[in-house]
Regions:
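Acetyl-CoA-dependent GNAT
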Residues: 52-95
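Hydrophobic pocket/interface hotspot
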Residues: 31, 98, 149
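Conserved catalytic-core motifs of GNAT/GCN5-like acyltransferases
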Residues: 137, 153-170
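Conserved acetyl-CoA-binding loop-helix of GNAT-fold acetyltransferases
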Residues: 109-124, 147, 151
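Conserved N-terminal entry element of GNAT/NAT acetyltransferase domains
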Residues: 1-26, 40, 178-191
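Conserved GNAT-fold acetyl-CoA-binding loop/helix
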Residues: 39-59
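Conserved beta-strand-loop-alpha-helix junction that forms the acyl-donor binding cleft
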Residues: 134-146, 163
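Conserved acetyl-CoA binding element of GNAT-fold acetyltransferases
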Residues: 88, 93-105, 137
């Protein structure tokens, strides 16, 4: 297992009818819009409604990206951005966390699910990761995402408490994800 694999800074991918690329400073306004939306941001850590602060965060993130520790993706459908998701906590060899997953409303189930699957495919196939470990977890009241995580092959490992409440922690070995992926692709007609 090569734990030093990295994505190029100009990484892009087209999969399941979506275009994916790494976030840059020009995306700050879109990210702030997503993360500060009261409904969309209900279960995530709060973000200030400050575009300049988000640009600063992205500049710091780009250092982690260059080191292969963090990848923040933006997803497009028909040339318009509609979602973000991340791979992070990659400082432990063979492991990663997927999160910060937010999608604009009004997109199909297939498109939303694809924005969750694609980063995992990148982690397992391109970065040679062996296990996803959700150390920060998913808020226990975010029942749809907890259920979704179980549906794609994640296993509950425990619960942790922070200022926003109780979070369910998960992990998922690569083989469990790939055991479920073909069925998900068939059910959702993802090509």
């Amino acid at each position: 297992m090569n734990t030093n694999k990295k994505l190029p800074s100009d990484f892009t991918m087209d999969k399941y009818g979506l275009h994916v690329r790494l976030v840059n400073e020009d995306d700050a306004e879109f990210i702030v819009k997503l993360r500060t939306d009261e409904k969309l941001g209900k279960y995530i850590h709060s973000t200030l409604p400050d575009i300049e602060k988000q640009k600063e965060w992205i500049r710091e993130y780009k250092k982690r990206e260059a080191d292969g520790l963090d990848y923040y993706f933006i997803f497009y459908k028909d040339g318009e951005p509609f979602a973000v998701n991340r791979l992070y906590h990659m400082d432990v060899p063979g492991r990663f966390t997927s999160g910060s997953w937010i999608c604009l409303p009004g997109h199909s189930t297939e498109e939303v699910v694809a924005t969750s699957l694609i980063p995992r495919i990148i982690a397992f196939e391109m970065l040679d990761k062996e296990i996803e470990y959700g150390v920060e977890g998913c808020h226990e009241d975010n029942k749809k995402v907890v259920k979704y995580n179980l549906m794609i092959g994640m296993h509950i490992k425990g619960r942790i408490k922070d200022v926003k409440g109780i979070y369910v922690t998960f992990d998922m070995p690569k083989e469990d994800f790939y055991a479920k992926l073909p069925k998900l692709e068939r059910l959702l007609n993802l090509k």
